[in-house]
Amino acid sequence: MNRIQSVFSQLKSQNRAALIPFITAGDPDATTTVALMHRLTQAGVDLIELGVPFSDPMADGPTIQRSSERALKHHISLKDVFSMVAEFRKTNQSTPVVLMGYANPIEAMGYKDFVQTAGHAGVDGVLVVDYPPEECTEWVRYLKEQNIDPIFLLSPTTPESRIRRVAELARGYVYYVSLKGVTGASHLDLHEVGDKLSQLRSYINIPIGVGFGIRDEQTARRIAEQADAVVIGSRIVEEIEHSPAADLLANVGALVESLRRAIDAKSDHSSITEK
């Protein structure tokens, strides 16, 4: 059992949903990113999604696009991202880290070198936004050889054939994009999310996390009543963007602690062990 599977197994036994934050590696700088990762774990997160900065992040809204731009101004490379994970691993061996990004930097490095370096750094999963599951058999094979979980996105418009394909390939968890469009959008329909999760669970037997559009404690709690994990990105990245350097860790920590409390306050009747 790897770190991701271990975390979800423990949470299931406790009837708790996972809290998964997203931050961009190198925003505002590499040293602060590692400090942020540790502050997030202190605030109660269960897994960290670490974005690989990219010049054309097509699935991301303006907030996360700007975070990529800030990181790229510091010339943050894929090698730097691995170094941040390795630095984090020096003192944290338990919190899973999932890299989230786009295909170009991976293909420039090559599948084999990427997964070997990721494995040595302590990466637990990789989500590549623009890899169609129908075309990544070789990619998934390389990941699994290093015991790295391939994470996939599903959306409200994903056809049944692709859902079945993701069910075959995915390991660790599946990330359900709860809105059409880009990250940070609003107008989340919680009833629609619940219906879709019920449908997805007829195909998928690993945990399902829900992200995109979760911006406050009430929505996080409601999602936690239905999903195995709550993924929050844009709201946290906004806090990073607008916080003075001296207050950044404290502000992000306070935000995440409030989200953790909200998620743990989910209704008792909505057991993830019953799903």
Swiss-Prot record:
It comes from the Bacteria. Pathway: Amino-acid biosynthesis; L-tryptophan biosynthesis; L-tryptophan from chorismate: step 5/5. It is an enzyme of class 4 (lyase). CDD domains: Tryptophan_synthase_alpha. It catalyses: (1S,2R)-1-C-(indol-3-yl)glycerol 3-phosphate + L-serine = D-glyceraldehyde 3-phosphate + L-tryptophan + H2O. One of its GO terms (molecular function) is tryptophan synthase activity. GO terms for cellular component: cytosol. The active site is at E49, D60. Keywords: Amino-acid biosynthesis, Aromatic amino acid biosynthesis, Lyase, Tryptophan biosynthesis. Coiled coil: none annotated. It holds the Pfam family Trp_syntA. PROSITE patterns: TRP_SYNTHASE_ALPHA. Its EC number is 4.2.1.20. Belongs to the TrpA family. Tetramer of two alpha and two beta chains. The alpha subunit is responsible for the aldol cleavage of indoleglycerol phosphate to indole and glyceraldehyde 3-phosphate. This is Tryptophan synthase alpha chain. The lineage of its organism: Bacteria, Pseudomonadati, Pseudomonadota, Betaproteobacteria, Nitrosomonadales.
